[in-house]
Structure formats: structure tokens, C-alpha cells
């Protein structure tokens, strides 16, 4: 769709104008069976945002391997809407084409956060990670890893093509729903 392409071009231009190149990032994430892969995203945070995590640790409002801060100072000014509407995730369709990800599945976590996994969490590595999933349509802004894990296991245990289609169809509703937006 031309409008989507134009919209992505506008996101790219705004990001480059506000914080320079590159307009996308590659992050090491954990995929199927613990395979490390490079996940692509539009860059909405400052260049050294991952390194700043340690200095902002006391502000972290999440548990386990999650890291979320309300009004995160690492986000580039005026790009909050890109994150709010998950536009930064669109480059992950390249990961789907490469076979590293699926459209639906558990969200891939950073490779350097796996030390926070206990044995039961490893079960989420038995499926391809996804761009969207049960978490994203039910409680996408939760800061509790146990909630993430609960939805991941529910997805794994109930997987079907029909289930994936339902999740895909509900994703836009979840993204634009006021009741789900938050942290």
C-alpha cells in the first residue's frame, strides 16, 4: 500500500532528522531453540539506549528479563507515536522472510537477558518468536514477565492456524485500543 510506504518514509525522515543515522537497529535476540539472530526494528531510541539500561535500572518497572520505564528518557523526542502504534516493529517482516521469526509467536528477548530465565522459561524457545502474539492482543503493556510467560505457554499449547489468524486479526484492534495502551 502506498500510504503505508509513505508513512514509513515519514518515520524514517523524522528519525534521521531528530537523531541521525542509522534509521534502523539490529538487536541480538533469542529465537527457536536458543538460536541467536539479528532482529530489525526502526530505531526510536537514542544510539546508546541499550548501554543506558544499567544506569536506569532503578527506574525499571518490570520484572525478570523485561525492562520498561514510563516516559523512558531513551526514546527520541516526538517518536513516541511510532512505539505507541508498534510501527517500529514493521521491519521484523524481514526477519519473517529470513525464517528467524513468525508473524505470530512469543516476543523474542534480548540474548543477554537469557541468564534471567529459569528452566521453565526455556519452553518458550520451542517455537519461532513472533511479531505479535497473545500478549500483544491481551495485555501488551504489562510489566510482569510471568504474564508474558502465561500467554506464551497458552499460545504454545493451543497453537493452530485458526488461532494464528484470530491473533493477526485482533492485533490492529489491540494496537489502537485505548484500554490496552499504557506503560
Predicted regions: what they are:
Residues 69-72, 83-87, 159-162:
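Short, solvent-exposed loop/helix junctions and linker helices
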Residues 74-100:
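Short, conserved beta-strand/loop elements in beta-sheet-dominated catalytic cores
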